[in-house]
Amino acid sequence: MHINYVISLTSAYQRREHIQKEFSQQNIPFEFFDALKPSKELTSLIEKFIPNLLHAKLTEGEKACFMSHYMLWQKCFSEDLPYIYIFEDDVLLGENADKFLAEDEWLEEAFKQTDKFILRFETFLNFSKCKDKKIKPYSGRKILKLVSENCGAAGYVISREAVKQLSAHICSLTSNHLLAIDLLMFNIFNQSTYQVSPGVCVQEGQLYPKDIKLHSQLETERQKYLSVKKKRTLKTVLISLAGKPKKILRKIYRKLFISKHIVPFR
């Protein structure tokens, strides 16, 4: 029987209470994994495992998030686990989530122990082009091959073989190529990624963007980082206006095409 690890800061009392309620409602066992935060400990771990991450163009919070996931991967590798289930502490669980998170037989039927895979339980409610690889559906959900890039690392299971290869790839990257952990997993490494559809979990902020109760310090930090912009000039204003027709066309395209490739949450 596997353990569902939920990455959470020890000080995130509201989020931990949320997870206790969310998982206990379906009798899903889990353990909190104390999330790393900007500190001497974080710096020490980065220096030991991924030195180039120190100079990556990420916020300190993003580096802490990166290493929290990475250290769980190392736990999978060091304890010789066939796979490890990892979640973040703002997830909402769908119906019958216990069938996927409290049982192992379905996963062992879908994949071999020697397979290299990352299986997303999460839907980010964005464009997610998938292919049917003829894996047997389970409990009303399909297991599809994810063929498009994606983002979000709030709910997934990763195999030991994938941990081994992805860790080696990450350690080979220069600081300029080290991105947020989810982008490396589902953009750069997407040849080994799969998607449960409909999604088993979703981040609160993706499902209820206008009614977020579980506020994120990481997201606040990221938005501050992104909001540092140069003063707009007449040239940039004119360029922006010239691009408006393209934006309108993109909206139409999203409605007609992209909406057909969104993994639903149920």
From Swiss-Prot:
Class of the enzyme per the UniProt entry, highest EC level: transferase
Keywords assigned by UniProt?
Glycosyltransferase, Transferase, Virulence
Pfam families per the UniProt record, alphabetical: Glyco_transf_25 (PF01755)
Q: What is its EC number?
A: 2.-.-.-
- Among its keywords, does the record have Glycosyltransferase? yes
Q: According to its UniProt record, which protein family does this protein belong to?
A: Belongs to the glycosyltransferase 25 family.
Taxonomic lineage from the root:
Bacteria, Pseudomonadati, Pseudomonadota, Gammaproteobacteria, Pasteurellales
A GO molecular-function annotation: glycosyltransferase activity
* Stored CDD domains: Glyco_transf_25
Q: What does this protein do?
A: Involved in extracellular lipooligosaccharide (LOS) biosynthesis and virulence expression. Involved in the synthesis of the oligosaccharide moiety of the LOS molecule by adding GalNAc.
State the name under which the record lists this protein: Lipooligosaccharide biosynthesis protein lic2B
Give the matching InterPro entries. Glyco_trans_25 (IPR002654)
